[in-house]
């Protein structure tokens, strides 16, 4: 069986280092897909915590080629504001695309911008802007329900921008989620574990099944359980075209490696 530890793997660079270029390319492709879905000129409003991952992924010239005219950092709107006039956005384009994590502060900010636009335009008049949101790494049901509750779900286009591991160096990968520890240990929110499991599954699709998983602590154990469950679901589920996730010869269609689910175990 060929796995991430196979020195003869075609996805390994010289000197035994793993070639992480596919991860960078995957992130760039996901971002390009979102930008291309809005062909018109667009303004980006960006969650400041995404500055690091985005800077590692794209440059200004590439953004301009895909119709990005202006970029601004998102600023959190105070929940106590009684008027929406002060939260109107002044974008130079009709298309506005938010890039943010699915956090309450940002969906409230987006709602405040939408309400200000609606009030300024009048209930029966077209809005000045068209709103799209790319949630990193993916939308949550809470986001969808929030927009539905406030009557703007149909007016806001939502995408999932699956940015997972950022390539910091040839041997350093990071999820670049500075609030993960606070969510896990203070808020009791295990969403970061779910996102981490998805990211680790992506690694397995590229390089093959992890032959060994080692962790320490309750949260590491929960992450491992999530990863094992997702791997089993992946192996047991057919894709959208009806093709088996595992070929008849027992290899993974993503990696070409021999699949043996029993190799995925915890120590």
PLM ranges: what are they?
Residues 1-267:
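Extended, well-folded catalytic/binding cores that form a central cleft or groove in large enzyme
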């Amino acid at each position: 069986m060929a796995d991430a530890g196979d020195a003869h793997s075609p996805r390994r660079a010289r000197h035994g280092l793993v070639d992480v270029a596919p991860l960078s390319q995957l992130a760039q492709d996901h971002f390009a897909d979102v930008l291309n879905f809005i062909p018109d000129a667009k303004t980006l409003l960006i969650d400041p915590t995404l500055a690091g991952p985005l800077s590692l992924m794209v440059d200004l010239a590439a953004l301009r080629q895909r119709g990005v005219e202006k970029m601004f950092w998102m600023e959190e709107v105070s929940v106590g504001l009684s008027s929406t006039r002060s939260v109107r956005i002044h974008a130079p384009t009709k298309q506005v695309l938010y890039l943010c994590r699915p956090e309450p502060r940002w969906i409230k900010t987006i709602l405040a911008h939408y309400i200000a636009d609606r009030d300024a335009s009048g209930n029966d008049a077209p809005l000045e802007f068209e709103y799209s949101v790319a949630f990193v790494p993916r939308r949550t049901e809470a986001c969808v329900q929030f927009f539905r509750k406030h009557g703007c779900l149909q007016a806001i286009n939502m995408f999932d921008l699956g940015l997972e591991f950022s390539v910091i160096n040839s041997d350093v990968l990071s999820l670049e989620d500075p609030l993960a520890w606070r969510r896990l240990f203070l808020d009791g929110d295990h969403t970061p574990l779910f996102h981490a499991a998805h990211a680790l599954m992506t690694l397995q699709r590229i390089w093959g099944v992890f032959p060994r998983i080692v962790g320490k602590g309750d949260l590491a154990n929960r992450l491992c359980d999530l990863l094992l469950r997702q791997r089993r679901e992946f192996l047991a589920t057919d894709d959208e075209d009806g093709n088996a996730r595992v070929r008849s010869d027992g290899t993974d269609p993503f990696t070409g490696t021999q699949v043996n689910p029993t190799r995925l175990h915890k120590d």
